[in-house]
Regions:
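Metal-dependent phosphoesterase signature
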Residues: 29-30, 38-79, 86
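A structural signal for isolated positions on well-ordered beta-strands in alpha/beta enzyme cores
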Residues: 87-89, 131, 152, 169-171
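Short catalytic/ligand-binding loop motif for oxyanion handling, primarily in non-cytosolic enzymes
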Residues: 13-15, 97-101, 141-143, 161-163, ...
Length: 198
């Protein structure tokens, strides 16, 4: 049984709408900003309010994470993988609390999102809590991927994939296809995953 490791933030989840809505609710951005995390960040940076974005991240990843969308087609793709005999493990670089702002328990929030989205349901993905790992540093994340014997790892950050042992099959999830300088296998949509593994 092959083990597939999965990143969490911006790989299983899509925060674009939630970043936009939370920033609007806090009156941090005008309405005409694009409903994307990057657009919100770039706007706040352009008006010298980068600290507000750091605060916003804590809100989104903590207090409001339950409102985050699934990455399009992700859940169906993971069901397909399980049907083909793959074992799923989630390995995320996620600190317990945000860098700034209120001390939301980010890991607890992520578990609640996974629960809400049927990752633990017997009639869903039926993952166990010990299939989920949150690590405090990128280095510990890389170690965990190795310890859990992941043969494949999917992440939205090429800098993470660059650190992973090249004997592990590394797949870059890049919905906007904006990481062309990297030679990893790449998917823009989760629906493409099965075809590049077969």
């Amino acid at each position: 049984m092959k083990i597939i490791g999965l990143d969490f933030d911006n790989t299983l989840t899509n925060y674009d709408n939630l970043f936009y809505q939370t920033a609007r609710d806090l009156a941090l951005i005008p309405q005409n900003i694009k409903s994307e995390k990057v657009a919100v960040r770039n706007y706040l940076k352009s008006i010298n309010k980068e600290d507000e974005f750091t605060f916003l991240q804590g809100k989104v990843y903590g207090e409001r994470i339950a409102e985050a969308d699934q990455a399009k087609g992700m859940y169906e793709a993971l069901i397909d993988l399980q049907c083909k005999g793959y074992k799923l493990k989630i390995v995320s670089h996620k600190t317990k609390y945000p860098i700034k702002g209120y001390k939301y328990d980010l890991r607890k929030g992520a578990i609640e999102w996974l629960s809400k989205n049927k990752f633990f349901n017997k009639n869903g993905l039926n993952l166990k809590r010990d299939d989920i790992f949150f690590e405090s540093t990128k280095e510990l994340k890389i170690e965990r991927i190795f310890k859990e014997k992941c043969e494949i790892f999917i992440d939205d950050l090429p800098e993470i994939l660059n650190l992973i042992d090249p004997r592990i099959d590394r797949i870059l999830y890049s919905p906007k296809n904006d990481n062309n300088k990297y030679n990893f296998k790449k998917i823009q949509e989760w629906a493409e995953l099965i075809s590049i593994l077969d």
